[in-house]
Amino acid sequence: MPVPPSAAPRAITYVGHSTVAITLDGVTLVTDPLLRRRIGHLVRYAPPVVPVTADAVLISHAHQDHLDPPSLAKLGRDTPLIVPVGVAGLLRRRRFRDIREVVPGDRVTIGSVEIEATAADHPGNRPPTRINVESLGYIVRGSRTVYFAGDTGLFPGMARIGDEPIDVALIPIDGWGPKVETGHLDPVGAAEAVRLLRPRIAIPIHWGTYAPFKRPARDPIATVETFASLAGAAARVLAPGERLEV
């Protein structure tokens, strides 16, 4: 017999970088899949990628470490891809067949969960192509509400997202470059995002996974510990590959 959605597993698996498997009410959504050991000069120094499957994929923006066609292919070319407007052509040329372009406010239903695209503050270009799209976050609603911030800095609408009760917020806390630039959150900014959003659980992402030639610009453990101390009781730190029942 089918498992009722309310009785199905509800879990967050931090795969690493911006890749998270959100399992909710019988549906698994994977965010920004990066499932390779290496992409360009970025090399995975965390443990190998845990196996993941997806009923749909959420893409936040067009940067190569967030929109990676070889990683998407591992999840199947018929898997629905929910993406910013402007990247469908790139994906169709790579033979992906179910592409759903969205802008902030658009909603998509996958199984028993609803996904709403939200704004984000992050560059949307994809060098060396001419692609330049609006970066997104996503709210996933079912028996739990999960907010995936994508890659973002603080932005005016973030507090309004927190007007809705959020069970789990997935918040980026670092970048891989020598400094955390505009359009990103460092641990202090990420803790401020938690204050604005007021989630029950805040899970840091975009840390501890990839670095240029396996040489992180900052100590990842110190980075995540700083976030956890500033974010307070809501913070739940998952190492790459770790799963939390929610």
Where are these regions (language model features)?
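A short helix->loop->beta-strand "cap" motif at the edges of active sites that frequently abuts
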Residues: 27, 77-80, 96-97, 198-201, ...
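Active-site neighborhood of phospho(di)ester-bond hydrolases with catalytic His/Asp-centered motifs
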Residues: 31-32, 53-65, 82-85, 147-152, ...
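Beta-strand-turn-beta hairpins that frame and shape the catalytic cleft
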Residues: 5-12, 23-29, 107-116, 141-146, ...
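Pre-active-site segment of Zn-dependent metallo-hydrolases
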Residues: 2-4, 21-62, 69-74, 83-86, ...
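Active-site-proximal loop/helix segment associated with metal-binding centers of metalloenzymes
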Residues: 117-143, 152-157, 164, 168-170
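Cap/insert and terminal regions of metallo-dependent hydrolase folds
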Residues: 86-89, 156-242
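Zn-dependent metallo-beta-lactamase
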Residues: 1-30, 35-37, 219-222, 226, ...
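Short, polar loop motifs at secondary-structure junctions
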Residues: 16-17, 84-90, 103-105
